[in-house]
């Protein structure tokens, strides 16, 4: 009986609605006096934290988790248009992150905290819950293996063979003879795209999360006969 070794890469991607949004908020105050900018940044951050604590509940949300950095103060000496170096300017900064399960509540909160002095929105990360991630990862992995079986079967049929049997399975690159851009271990990855329109405070904030892509790949070696 004729047997042929076939080695292929199976891949699968799927898209899922975002379930969590982590907002990164920064407080930054500039001024000529170190103590003043420190006090102003601390006050703004305290108000920001109070708004988070009022919404925080690990189980029911809308904020399920949050963190806050301490105050850092840096300084620099700017130059004017005539090339003269000016007096020291101090900058007090604090970073805050808050994870939301309710995107409408997130919009309302950003609209509220944007009114605080020195507060700016650094960005928003979209994600799935851990439970959803575990479930969809398992499914995507299985489907990537199914894709490998389908490819191998097609190749086998093209050379007149009818059955394929897997003899090795591994992360991409670990079988040693599959050329691809990805080398080494390959874990399912989560990618997201979203748009964030931060207008004036009076106009409000509009968030439009897009679906999250979960992808997986696997190398499989078969004996075809």
Regions found by a protein language model. Name each.
Residues 1-225:
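Short, charge-dense linear interaction motifs
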């Amino acid at each position: 009986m004729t047997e042929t070794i076939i080695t292929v890469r199976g891949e699968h991607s799927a898209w899922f609605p975002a379930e969590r949004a982590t907002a990164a908020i920064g407080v930054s105050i500039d001024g000529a006096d170190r103590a003043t900018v420190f006090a102003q940044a601390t006050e703004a951050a305290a108000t920001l934290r109070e708004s988070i604590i009022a919404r925080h509940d690990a189980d029911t949300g809308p904020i399920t988790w949050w963190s806050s950095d301490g105050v850092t103060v840096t300084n620099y000496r700017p130059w004017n248009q005539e090339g003269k170096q000016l007096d020291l300017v101090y900058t007090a900064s604090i970073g805050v992150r808050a994870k939301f399960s309710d995107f409408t509540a997130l919009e309302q909160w950003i609209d509220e905290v944007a009114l605080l002095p020195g507060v700016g929105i650094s960005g928003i990360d979209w994600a799935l819950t851990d439970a959803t991630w575990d479930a969809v990862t398992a499914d995507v992995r299985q489907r990537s293996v199914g894709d490998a079986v389908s490819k191998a079967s097609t190749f086998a049929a093209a050379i007149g063979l009818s059955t394929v049997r897997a003899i090795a399975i591994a992360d991409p690159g670990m079988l040693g003879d599959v050329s691809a851009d990805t080398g080494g271990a390959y874990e399912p990855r989560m990618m997201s795209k979203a748009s964030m329109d931060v207008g004036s405070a009076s106009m409000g904030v509009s968030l439009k999360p897009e679906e999250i892509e979960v992808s997986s790949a696997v190398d499989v070696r078969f004996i075809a006969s």
